[in-house]
Amino acid sequence: MGASDSTLAHSRGTLRRLIAVSAEGVASGAPLMVGSRLLQGWLTASGVPLALIGLIPLAELPYTLKLFWAPLLDRWPIPWPDRRRGWLLLMQLLLVAVIAAMALLRPSSDPSQLTAVGLAALVLAICSATQDIAVDAYRTDLLPEAERGAGAAAAALGYRAAMLSVGAGGFLLADRFGWPAAFLSAAALVAAMVPFTLSAPKLAPVEHAITSLRQAVLGPAREFVHRAGPNRTWQLLLLVLLYRWPDGLLNAMAIPFLKLQGFSEADIGLVQGGWAIGATILGTVIGGSLFAWLGMNRSLWLFAISGVIGNLSYWALARFGGGVAGLITAVSLENISSGMVGAVFVALLMSLCNPRFSATQYALLSGVYALSRSP
């Protein structure tokens, strides 16, 4: 095989992996929007009391607690099509069934109907959170180091596309054809990802398969400490905990800050709800593209600096003003830098995982990161 043929084969392999990762991002983002925005809109339109709608976040607890059953995916892999895609396929089929079943329910003040909706939302969250574990593990095991930045960008693009499709598109369908059509379209979107899961690149067999639940539960932490060393373990955990901490603080205070600057709800909604999403996607693509050239260490430093610059754009907005144009500039800079930081952060988490324990280790590292987002 000549050099050009080898390069072409490598490019095709890269493209195939990125398409697979992006498709799994779609499959991951769609159920989350169904269980939050779509469900809230449906219950509100059906006249369900706000006090009951406020309980929806309780059904989303599986997303927070998923690290407790992540070891099960490492211990008992489903061998077909491979150890990660087996779980992906199972969860996607279950998600299609649950979302489609929700379209048949009629939420009202009837306790039996509300109970059915609540149980469906809980099952949806459990299946979706389990799929997220498998998606993270598959992406981690599949992508070589040089492609992890681009893979993070591809996953984010798929995820955002699903959120827009189910969030905005679902409400448009509900307005025109009714809420069952919105849920059925979301189920169809997840179902459309099943062929991508079946045709995605197959993972290489892992050496030294896990043979006990004890090993699946205790092994990930032991292996991580052994591989990194005690001192470096704490350094890495602090990096995971603090690297995106400024983003979390800014996100929590952005809306109150902009209100204090005198911007209207319409201005904030238009810029934060629309423009910011596009800027984040652009930043993720830029970050993923630069990662392959810069590598992990330089990307971590340079993207962190870009994050500081992005955050300072809000200081400049408060100091110098600028009206709506200044708002758009500040939000654009902050979200572009946030997208870049997010791309390298996902690549960092993937690089810290061992393929034997990637489901559990990624879930644990994500849990450490989640602590920085807690109030």
Specify the residue positions occupied by each region the protein language model found:
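Symmetry-related core transmembrane helices of the 12-TM Major Facilitator Superfamily/SLC fold
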Residues: 90-96, 181-199
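Juxtamembrane intracellular "pre-TM" segments in multi-pass secondary transporters
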Residues: 2-14, 202-236
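Glycine-rich segments within core transmembrane alpha-helices of 12-TM secondary carriers
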Residues: 63-66, 149-170, 174, 366-375
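C-terminal ends and interior cores of transmembrane alpha-helices
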Residues: 88-111, 305-322
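Intracellular juxtamembrane helix-capping segments at the cytosolic ends
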Residues: 129-143, 340-354, 360, 366
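Helix-loop boundary and gating motifs at the non-cytosolic
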Residues: 7-63, 234-239, 243-257, 261, ...
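Helix-to-loop junctions at the C-terminal end of transmembrane segments
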Residues: 65-82, 282-299
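C-terminal transmembrane helical hairpin of 12-TM major facilitator-type secondary transporters
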Residues: 298-348
